[in-house]
């Protein structure tokens, strides 16, 4: 891939952008109904369901709206009212979009729950939220049914499959249902109760308003290289619908997680473009075949997914014909090796982005694959989190809430007001029933993310790790991400996680847990080779003094490595050795 016209448009993009958030807004209206109610857009594809062994299913915006109207009537008959929490325990499928739309247009609150959750995780969330109803399928129905006795607020379960739930709902047989009157929600009204992934402790329910979806759009459009629209297009007027894009989106990110919901599903529908749904397990084969079959143009892939694809298909163009225009990645640092692979082999410059459940999509890149001549975009620096997206005032701050000098590590934080002094709509409303935790998230008007970074002279942020992931070894400050990225550059390493191992003399040793690539076996010789590899690229104090090979790293349901689990394991082992 060659760089064509590389200009830095970051400063003027931030200066020119102004938020226009309506007083009243509902996600269901913005993402579905406005497309379904017009004859020239009603039959546009909204959801394409991929099947590995059968033809794909296609559903239009009109079909989503008709089914959602019917489901809203059913939910109302079960006593669901505005403000109630409704649990949705579904994978990527057409009915998930129907369920979300139905709940939102009633003014109720969607509580997405992953099917990967075990009984304890589900019970905690159902009890903590006091959800009044659960929407399930044949996979999740039985476990939710068993929990109803311990979750008295849950009145019933509605099943999206014929053999699930207390009552079944067929989303495809609802074409004659009476229209549902859209609730008059304010943009600041609650829309989603989504629980944090729990990398640092018990999950907290973050209450997200409808307007947060609008707040995500600048980051989405930038990280997806303008999502198929012309950078020189004119601003929309009034109720005019966006047009001109032929984008097709797919991401393996679960739609029950902020990343899958706000970074893929909802923005795609908001712009009237289809998203591919796939509820099976991820694999490199699946990813390439799916993207080729459905001519996917835009995607959000975790670094772990990109690493797997790079290892499985070093030269994918020899086997697949892809139409990729943009790749966004988040969750962990991409690293130099994956960044270079995507440029050289996929023809796309990865746009890394950063955010969290509470303030999503606030920092990232907009590389435009090297063509920034039309006043849009800026260069992506390999390994950098990127810069603040338009509409967001981001800084690295110290413990007192003061901005850190260039190159000095601090907490990545988002200000309540953008650079023009306008309120930023991306903020969460607070943690569910936890006012103290909500208040502790802020220092003045700065919302702390708990992620450490440095900022360079050009405004690029460089990730240093979670505040609780960074540790000291022999007096040196160790950030695990840089060491992990270095390890993954070695052909034998599929994935890696670095944690402290307690040591009486040094305080901690640097320890790496390594998942080997196919064709490699654990050995003392390989340990020495990996240590030499890191020593040759990083500082001498950063190389892992100990390496343990494991089959898989502990991961959250959202694809993030749970270093905390490994760190606690090391602490437990050390305690047993202490006399």
Feature map (PLM): residue ranges:
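Conserved pre-ATP/AMP-binding loop-to-beta segment of ANL
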Residues: 43-45, 159, 164, 174-195, ...
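Conserved AMP-binding/adenylate-forming core of the ANL superfamily
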Residues: 43-101, 118-123
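Conserved AMP-binding A3 loop
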Residues: 57-62, 191-218
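Structural core segment of the AMP-binding/adenylate-forming
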Residues: 77-78, 101, 105-171, 518
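AMP-binding/adenylate-forming catalytic core of the ANL superfamily
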Residues: 117, 124, 134-137, 299, ...
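Conserved AMP-binding/adenylation subdomain of ANL enzymes
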Residues: 214-298, 312
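Gly/Ser/Thr-rich phosphate-binding loop
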Residues: 270, 296-301, 312-379, 393
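Conserved ATP/PPi-binding loop(s) of AMP-dependent carboxylate-activating enzymes
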Residues: 387-391, 402-440, 478
């Amino acid at each position: 891939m060659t760089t064509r016209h590389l200009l830095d448009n970051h400063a003027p993009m931030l200066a020119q952008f102004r938020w226009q958030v309506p007083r009243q807004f509902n996600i269901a209206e913005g993402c579905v109904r406005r497309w379904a109610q017009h004859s020239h857009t009603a039959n546009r594809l909204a959801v394409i369901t991929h099947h590995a062994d059968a033809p794909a299913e296609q559903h239009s915006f009109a079909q989503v709206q008709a089914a959602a109207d019917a489901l809203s009537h059913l939910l109302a008959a079960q006593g669901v009212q505005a403000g109630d929490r409704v649990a949705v325990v579904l994978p990527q499928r057409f009915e998930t979009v129907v369920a979300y739309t139905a709940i939102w247009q009633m003014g109720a609150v969607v509580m997405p729950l992953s099917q990967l959750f075990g009984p304890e995780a589900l019970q905690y969330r159902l009890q903590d939220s006091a959800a009044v109803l659960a929407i399930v399928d044949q996979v999740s129905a039985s476990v939710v049914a068993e929990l109803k006795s311990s979750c008295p607020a849950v009145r019933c379960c509605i099943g999206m499959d014929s053999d699930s739930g207390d009552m079944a709902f067929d989303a495809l047989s609802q074409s004659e249902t009476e229209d549902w009157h859209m609730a008059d929600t304010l943009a600041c009204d609650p829309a989603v109760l989504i629980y944090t992934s729990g990398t640092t402790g018990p999950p907290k329910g973050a209450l997200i308003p409808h307007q947060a979806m609008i707040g995500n759009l600048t980051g989405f459009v930038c990280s997806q290289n303008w999502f198929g629209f012309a950078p020189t297009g004119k601003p929309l007027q009034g109720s005019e619908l966006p047009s001109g894009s032929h984008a097709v989106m797919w991401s393996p990110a679960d739609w029950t997680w902020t990343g899958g919901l706000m970074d893929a599903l909802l923005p795609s529908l908001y712009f009237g473009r289809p998203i591919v749904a796939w509820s099976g397990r991820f694999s490199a084969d699946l990813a390439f075949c799916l993207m080729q079959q459905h001519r996917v143009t835009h995607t959000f892939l975790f670094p772990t997914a990109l690493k797997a694809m790079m290892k499985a298909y070093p030269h994918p163009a020899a086997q697949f014909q892809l139409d990729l225009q943009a790749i966004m990645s988040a969750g962990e640092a991409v690293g130099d090796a994956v960044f270079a692979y995507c440029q050289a082999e996929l023809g796309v410059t990865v746009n890394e982005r950063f955010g969290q459940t509470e303030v999503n999509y606030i920092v990232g890149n907009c590389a435009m694959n090297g063509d920034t001549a039309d006043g849009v975009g800026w260069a992506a620096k390999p390994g950098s989190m990127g810069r603040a997206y338009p509409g967001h005032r981001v800084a690295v701050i110290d413990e007192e809430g003061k901005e850190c000098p260039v190159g000095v590590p601090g907490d990545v934080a988002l200000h309540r007001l953008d650079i023009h002094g306008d309120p930023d709509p991306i903020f969460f409303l607070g943690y569910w029933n936890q006012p103290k935790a909500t208040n502790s998230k802020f220092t003045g008007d700065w919302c702390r993310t708990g992620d450490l970074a440095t900022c360079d002279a050009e405004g690029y942020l460089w990730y240093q790790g979670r505040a609780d992931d960074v540790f000291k070894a022999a007096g040196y400050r160790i950030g695990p991400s840089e060491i992990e990225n270095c390890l993954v550059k070695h052909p034998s390493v599929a994935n890696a996680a670095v944690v402290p191992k307690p040591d009486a003399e040094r305080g901690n040793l640097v320890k790496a847990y390594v998942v080997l690539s196919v064709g490699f076996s654990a050995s003392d010789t390989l340990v020495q080779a990996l240590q030499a590899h890191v020593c040759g690229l990083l500082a001498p104090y950063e190389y892992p003094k100990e390496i343990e090979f494991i089959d898989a790293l502990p991961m959250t349901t959202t694809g993030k490595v749970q270093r905390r689990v490994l760190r606690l394991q090391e602490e437990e082992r050390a305690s047993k050795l202490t006399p």
